[in-house]
């Protein structure tokens, strides 16, 4: 029963105002139950009622990867894979690192994060503030790029730290299982979902969310969003400006058979979408968010009007204040080229051409199974 003081406080609220319980004993309980927001498609060329639902994972303390960070640690502890107080060592481009720093605080494990010079200074400083060690590699691997260089450094550190545990986000099935909660939240918020649009990096959230949503709608379509220069879907590796999606290695958690089609997006196109979202909806994010919004808007224009489209926005905009939202940076990298075309280029197979701008293919291949 509420105290008199509490009842008096509630009388001050406007009639009909709903209060969501928000008391948390530790920061791990703040993860999840993120909102969805209706986003009319951004091009402005179609019916304003056309749009998609954005799952705003930036409302988590550190972003979407708080979910797998906590879940992977919880599962490892339950299995006895990591001893109480043992070190956690992992490779990260930033977002999982924030989640692991959180998990380290919740479960009292020291955390060392191996990253590269592309990590934004604001994230490096915050990781240090959260108590994590930040280990920076200085040279990319000649074949596997920065990701392989980070993985190699993790292996070195694991040999130096007896009893340390590596989550291995690229191949750990718990990374996939962690997203069941996100999928069930979407079902509770939206009901039947016809199309899911996800960025693809480690492959965890696209596989984990789609698997659960298809328990409710087996015909749901999954659209994967990658960046140009990424090897995940069979393109050759090249320098990648966009972080948070794409890869220069082949993560085992990517479920190639789950995808109905894949889109590659270039940095200027993602920047346009991010800035458009910020200007029109006060809800934006980083490279993955811009790329996903561009593709989800395309789906909203081209699919029947009653199609329910869910798009996962993995983070918020704050860490990108000096890149995506910095005119000097964008001009230096020629990212302010104006509105992209309303339709992507199309290729029959990812092996047919090297893509350099927004491109779509309905043929999805597992490049590790391609015989040259």
UniProtKB/Swiss-Prot annotation:
Pfam families membership: PALP (PF00291)
Origin: domain of life: Bacteria
Pathway assignment: Amino-acid biosynthesis; L-cysteine biosynthesis
InterPro entries xref list: Cys_Synth/Cystath_Beta-Synth, TrpB-like_PALP, TrpB-like_PALP_sf
Molecular-function annotations in GO: cysteine synthase activity; L-cysteine desulfhydrase activity; O-phosphoserine sulfhydrylase activity; protein homodimerization activity; pyridoxal phosphate binding; transferase activity
Sequence similarity: Belongs to the cysteine synthase/cystathionine beta-synthase family.
Cofactor requirements of the protein: pyridoxal 5'-phosphate
Subunit structure, interactors included: Homodimer.
Binding-site positions, pyridoxal 5'-phosphate: 201-205, 288
Protein name: S-sulfocysteine synthase
First-level EC class: transferase
Catalytic activity, as annotated: O-phospho-L-serine + thiosulfate = S-sulfo-L-cysteine + phosphate; O-phospho-L-serine + hydrogen sulfide + H(+) = L-cysteine + phosphate
Organism this protein belongs to: Mycobacterium tuberculosis (strain ATCC 25618 / H37Rv)
Entry's Gene Ontology cellular component terms: cytoplasm; cytosol; peptidoglycan-based cell wall
């Amino acid at each position: 029963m509420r105290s008199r003081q509490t009842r008096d406080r509630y009388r001050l609220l406007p009639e009909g105002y709903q209060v969501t319980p928000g008391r948390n004993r530790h920061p791990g309980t703040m993860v999840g139950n993120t909102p969805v927001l209706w986003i009319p498609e951004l091009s402005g060329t179609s019916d304003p009622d056309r749009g998609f639902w954005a799952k705003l994972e930036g409302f988590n303390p550190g972003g979407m990867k708080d979910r797998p960070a906590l879940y992977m640690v919880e599962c490892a502890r339950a299995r006895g894979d990591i001893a109480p107080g043992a070190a956690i060592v992992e490779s990260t481009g930033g977002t999982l690192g924030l989640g692991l720093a959180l998990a380290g605080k919740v479960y009292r494990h020291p955390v060392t994060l191996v990253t590269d010079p592309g990590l934004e200074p604001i994230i490096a400083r915050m990781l240090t503030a959260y108590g994590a060690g930040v280990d920076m590699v200085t040279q990319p691997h000649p074949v596997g790029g920065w990701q392989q260089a980070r993985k190699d450094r993790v292996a070195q550190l694991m040999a130096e730290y007896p009893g340390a545990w590596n989550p291995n986000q690229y191949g750990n099935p718990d990374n996939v299982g962690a997203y069941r909660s996100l999928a069930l939240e979407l079902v509770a918020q939206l009901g039947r979902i016809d199309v899911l649009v996800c960025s693809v990096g480690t492959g965890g959230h696209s596989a984990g969310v789609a698997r659960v949503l298809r328990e409710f709608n087996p015909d749901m379509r999954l659209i994967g969003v990658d960046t140009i220069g990424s090897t995940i879907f069979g393109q050759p590796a090249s320098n990648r400006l966009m972080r948070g999606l794409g890869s220069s290695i082949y993560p085992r958690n990517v479920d190639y058979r789950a995808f109905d089609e894949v889109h590659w997006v270039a940095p200027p196109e993602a920047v346009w979408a991010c800035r458009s979202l910020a200007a029109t909806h006060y809800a934006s994010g980083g490279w993955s968010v811009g790329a996903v919004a561009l593709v989800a808007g395309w789906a909203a224009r081209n699919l029947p009007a009653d199609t329910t489209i869910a798009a996962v926005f993995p983070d918020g905009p704050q860490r990108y204040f000096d890149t995506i939202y910095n005119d000097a940076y964008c001009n230096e990298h020629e990212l302010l080229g104006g509105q992209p075309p309303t339709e992507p280029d199309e290729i029959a197979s990812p092996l047919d051409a090297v893509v350099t701008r927004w491109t779509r293919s309905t043929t999805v291949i597992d490049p590790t199974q391609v015989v040259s």
